[in-house]
A protein has these predicted regions:
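Hydrophobic transmembrane alpha-helices and their immediate loop junctions
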Residues: 1-151
Length: 151
């Protein structure tokens, strides 16, 4: 139970990063919604002005989420807490995973600001990871398919 609470907390911190950037940029947004087995989302109530603004919002989540993971790491090392160290691993993993340049993932939105072809590269990377057996998670397969549809 404590690990589950920590996971929800780290996901909340990640989403709060998006919300803080939206507040700073004057973008209205909806309350956070948890999506079972996937994570959470905060929807923008207006489209970003341009791809760079979308990329800034996308980058806010992994930045604050990674800081949350660092806090868990520091706390885990200082207190020798296996729980905090495990949560740090989870935090690093979800933020790194979220930076894959695929479709609706944060990395896909950031890469899309750099080049319209970045989504194709992300799909190639994701497909290669699946083909090589590096990722065997059915939820990732769904994300990859949705990214292909979106690209």
């Amino acid at each position: 139970f404590p690990y589950a609470v920590g996971m929800v907390g780290l996901i909340t911190v990640h989403e709060a990063g998006h919300a803080l950037v939206m507040l700073q940029r004057g973008i209205p947004f909806s309350p956070m919604v948890f999506v079972p087995f996937i994570g959470a989302t905060i929807a923008m109530n207006r489209r970003p002005r341009d791809a760079w603004e979308d990329a800034l919002v996308a980058f806010g989540g992994p930045v604050l989420g990674s800081l949350g993971a660092v806090a868990c790491s520091v706390g885990g090392v200082m207190t020798q807490s296996q729980l905090l160290l495990a949560l740090a691993d989870f935090g690093y993993m979800i933020n790194l995973f979220n930076m894959l340049p695929i479709g609706m993932m944060d990395g896909g939105r950031i890469a899309g600001a750099l080049s319209p072809y970045a989504g194709v590269v992300g799909l190639g990377i994701g497909g290669m990871l699946v083909y090589n057996g590096a990722i065997q998670n059915p939820i990732f397969y769904l994300i990859l398919m949705a990214g292909g549809y979106e690209t």
